[in-house]
Amino acid sequence: MSNGMKENPLEALYAFFEEGTKETVVFDLEWNQNGYAPNLRMPHEIIEIGACRLNERGEVTDRFSELIRPRLYRRVDKHIRQVTGITEQELSSGRTFPEVFADFARFCGDSAQLITWGRDDYPVLRRNLEYYMQPSPFSPPLDAQLVFGFAHFGDAHRQMNLHAALEETGTQLEVPAHRAVYDAECTAALLPAVSTGLEGLGEEKRNELSAILEREKRIADSVLRSRPTHYSVHTDALRDDAVTNLLCPLCGRKMSFAVAWFDAGRDRYEAIGRCAQHGQAHGQMHLKRGTNGYLTMHQRVFLASDDEVKAVSEAYRLFLLTPPAKRHHRLCMEEVRRVSERQNFPSKKG
């Protein structure tokens, strides 16, 4: 082109899009919460959806922006109000989430590649949909933040925030920060730089990135569960099937354990479950202590690759080889339950 611009500045990025993609939609969410008394079915309530549609040259051709009247958390968290400027008065005149989401889904269409900056938006969107008993019509979006980190720094886990990435790439865009549609526009403005970074990758690196993105999609489609308990210590929680059960991310049935829950470090538990119909899944669980002193279980379960099963199995083998005195109080479910049985303290079956 005579002006030196590429005819299709997103060409290298398209190689990582879903097959059959006809359009590109970048979206961003703002959400509210109550850190003191969260509803565990929907700990983060979406209060704004913003998006922009792009043509093949990466230019914004249409925008979507709407505030949402909250159902659970009517008072806007102080930090969220400071960052976004969104007020309770503005939200009170908004439409409900189901109404706004229906219009957003129509805006996206049936064959758009969705893109976000970061991995947080899609799980929050799914939990909001589940709260209203609606299925997600979308496949997991492409995480532009992850691709940017991999393409520019060789590290998919190097997470640069949106506005730092704009500065890093010299991308100029004069829009207010931390409102959904403007953050979506900022992400869209970065996509040519993301795509340019991919152009220099060899086949081996491209395959590595494809594998990372495939795993991220499986994680994005996780079964997410949160459950309050009346336990103040991990040993009690690990005896309760209602806390430790693994549910298949596809059919929702209870799975058997191929690798039982064990503390992989920092009170983060891992397990491998087996579904007779859908194969093996990777479980991750955190037992978080609340202000009342009791533990709340937060669990994520997603389909596991063979490599992930091997890695978790090996970590468990090494855990069992470590003498208990050197585990720094790390626990595993099987040992806790064996001790309980010897002490005639049966596990709670769920």
For each of these PLM feature ranges, what is it?
Residues 2-16, 193-350:
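Acidic two-metal-ion nuclease catalytic site recognized across multiple nuclease folds
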Residues 86, 134, 171, 253-255, ...:
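Short aromatic/hydrophobic-glycine micro-motifs
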Residues 4-7, 42-49, 53-84, 106-229, ...:
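Metal-dependent phosphoesterase core characteristic of DEDDh/y 3'-5' exonuclease domains
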Residues 38, 87, 91, 112, ...:
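A general structural-boundary detector
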